[in-house]
Amino acid sequence: MPRRRRTALILPVMALALTACGRFTVMPPPEGEPIRLKPADLTTTWTDADGGTLTLKQDGTFVAHQVCVAVAWYDSLAWSGTGTWEHGSNKKQSFVDVTFDADHPEVRGRMPDAYGALKQGEVLKLWAAVGDPDNDYPNCVLTSPAS
């Protein structure tokens, strides 16, 4: 078989195989720069795009009402309840881990992913990537009304 014809047959097959594997990149984080925050900066009510809220209290507890969370590859997951939260940071960004007192019925025994802190202008954000990274699920983004 001539080389040109063999190449013409191989290229479409390779293209199909690559597209079947999904995206080459994951969804980018929301707009904003990573920021390190003090625990006192986090103690407020954070709101997601659908009106869900996460109220972080100074004593390390929280109250959530239908707030978006990222758990494994589940998408569009909202969680209500109470629990505890912890603050952590690396060299450039703070993170908030939440632990609910009761399991979500869809994800028994799994913990939500940590939220990362961002700042866009004067707006503070907490965010987590949602769902399968090969799909275009929107990120879970919480904003602070105090910002």
Predicted regions and their residues:
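C-terminal motif of bacterial Sec signal peptides marking the signal peptidase cleavage site
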Residues: A17-A20
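N-terminal glycine/threonine-rich, aromatic-flanked beta-hairpin/loop signature
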Residues: A49-F100
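Bacterial N-terminal signal peptides that target proteins for export
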Residues: M1-L9
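Tryptophan-anchored aromatic micro-motifs
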Residues: P28-T53, W85-H87
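Beta-sheet ligand-binding and adhesion/scaffold domains
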Residues: F24-E33, G52, V63, K92-S147
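Short, solvent-exposed secondary-structure boundary motifs
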Residues: I35-L37, D41-D48, W73-W79, D103-R110
